[in-house]
């Protein structure tokens, strides 16, 4: 090998060794509905975008893929989770679905089954899973409302995964933090959503 080739090889090797350790990104896949899709606000104001910026500072080895769709249900999420897992090979999957199932009064047995399947598929892909809990207004009746809320904690216990008790904690009952529909948070509320998620997500970033 010529001396020039050897020098080039050494330079290339040094360049590779000087690359930051976080150059290879680990993906956090967010599979959610309008609450994660920044409905009614700018995309860069949503809690998922805020999460990306926080990761860049605190966990630069991770990046976010936001696969959230406004209006999506657990059935819709189940229908696209396989493709999302194959496409993005996530290290962590954040499942934020179920709110639209509840608001539409869909059968809770089906919702539980769909969420269970999404979690199972994600775990089978060797991803760590964070389940994001939701609640619905009491006008759906005490039985439906109570059973809806317990699905998230019960599934988290069953699969031994992390769970955010309620994404809209501190937001849902404050009209000043909600859009005109009384459901979707304003941009000013998005940092609170991230703070509700972060303590449960951070331990998964290893």
Predicted features by range, described:
Residues 22-70, 80-89:
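Serine-esterase "nucleophile elbow" of acetyl-processing enzymes
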Residues 18-20:
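N-terminal signal peptide c-region/cleavage motif recognized by signal peptidases
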């Amino acid at each position: 090998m010529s001396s020039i080739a050897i020098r080039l090889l050494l330079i290339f090797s040094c360049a590779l060794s000087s690359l930051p350790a976080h150059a290879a990104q680990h993906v956090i896949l967010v599979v959610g509905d309008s609450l994660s899709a920044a409905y009614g606000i700018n995309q860069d104001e949503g809690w998922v975008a805020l999460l990306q910026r926080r990761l860049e500072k605190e966990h630069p080895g991770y990046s976010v893929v936001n696969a959230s769709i406004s209006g999506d249900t657990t059935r819709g999420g189940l229908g696209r989770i396989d493709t999302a897992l194959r496409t993005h090979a996530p290290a962590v999957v954040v499942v934020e679905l179920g709110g639209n199932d509840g608001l539409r009064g869909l059968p809770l047995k089906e919702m539980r089954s769909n969420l269970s399947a999404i979690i199972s598929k994600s775990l089978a892909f060797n991803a760590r899973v964070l389940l994001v809990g939701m609640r619905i207004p009491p006008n759906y009746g005490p039985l439906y409302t109570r059973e809806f809320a317990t699905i998230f904690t019960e599934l988290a216990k069953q699969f031994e995964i992390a769970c955010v008790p309620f994404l809209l904690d501190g937001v849902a009952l404050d009209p000043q933090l909600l859009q005109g529909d009384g459901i979707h948070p304003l941009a000013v509320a998005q940092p609170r959503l991230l703070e509700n998620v972060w303590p449960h997500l951070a331990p998964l970033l290893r």
